[in-house]
Amino acid sequence: MSEEKQHKRRVHYSGKYPKKFEEKYKELNPEKYKDTIEHVISKGNTPAGMHISIMVKEIIDFLDIKPGQTGFDATLGYGGHTRAMLEKLEGQGHMFATDVDPIESEKTKKRLAEAGFGEDILTIKLQNFCTIDEIAKEVGGFDFILADLGVSSMQIDNPERGFSFKVDGPLDLRLNPNAGISAAERLDNISREELSGMLYENSDEPYCEELAKAITDEIRKGNRIGTTTKLRHIIEQTLDFLPEKDKKDIIKKTCQRTFQALRIDVNHEFEVLYEFMEKLPGALKPGGRAAILTFHSGEDKLVKKALKAGYKAGIYSDYSKDVIRPSAQECAQNGRARSTKMRWAVRAE
């Protein structure tokens, strides 16, 4: 008698971050596996391919949205904040949103349309949020504005986008993969001095000089740094001198800072944010409110300085002297919320 053919074993779902993005984990089908998604979130993790919006209640409470108003979401992303603001409009008024990511913005547009928020109440523009003045001029200004400056989890979780050092992928880091040059291309011709300055200015990297030397030496040898794994390995080798008890944690933080510095550079994030903050007062109607979420010291300092200057000049009637942070409960449920700071301002009447 012939042996019975063994069935292939089903891949056991552990509820953890997928090792390979392309594997069909339940996390990638949230509409079918709500219990699984809730389980992952309850553990303080973000399900793969999803983004959990941060400080939604605090933002909605501050913006004080009324039906009939006109609002602007500077960074559409997964659309969680946008949806919460749309719900407050109760079918009256209009929301405008911008995003430079053609891949994720199309998915979010479809997701929001299926939830009942179509083009009659929501206009999505594939452009940078520093063009807020152009949109404001068309519509007569905004009653409320939100700018969430964080990178969406969908981008981080997709290896093909090159945002994460945890998985192998092309070293890209562009928010819009169709515009500008990738991080790998940026490194191709960068000098040691320029790279050291970039790492220091964009992420306060304490090992900026050592890393800049190691990276540029590798490129000078003809070894292109084209993948996330390649860059991570160079960082690991550069910091191999560290004591064993500290090495793992320091390398992880250094990887985070290095990838952050490159992402800020290739997307011109500081230049875009500076331009946005300059145009923000003119885009708000008298009495209009703006809330901004920052995620690292560089952008937070820029936002704080701009709001304070606007208040002193009489442009804003009030602004946040201190930052508002996510609750301990939210940080426990969403680890990516821990570094978030919320600042706000009210346009003078």
Swiss-Prot record:
It catalyses: cytidine(1402) in 16S rRNA + S-adenosyl-L-methionine = N(4)-methylcytidine(1402) in 16S rRNA + S-adenosyl-L-homocysteine + H(+). InterPro entries: RsmH, SAM-dep_MeTrfase_MraW_recog, SAM-dependent_MTases_sf. SUPFAM superfamilies: Putative methyltransferase TM0872, insert domain, S-adenosyl-L-methionine-dependent methyltransferases. The keyword Cytoplasm applies. The keyword rRNA processing applies. One of its GO terms (cellular component) is cytoplasm. This is Ribosomal RNA small subunit methyltransferase H 1. It comes from Agathobacter rectalis (strain ATCC 33656 / DSM 3377 / JCM 17463 / KCTC 5835 / VPI 0990). The gene is rsmH1.
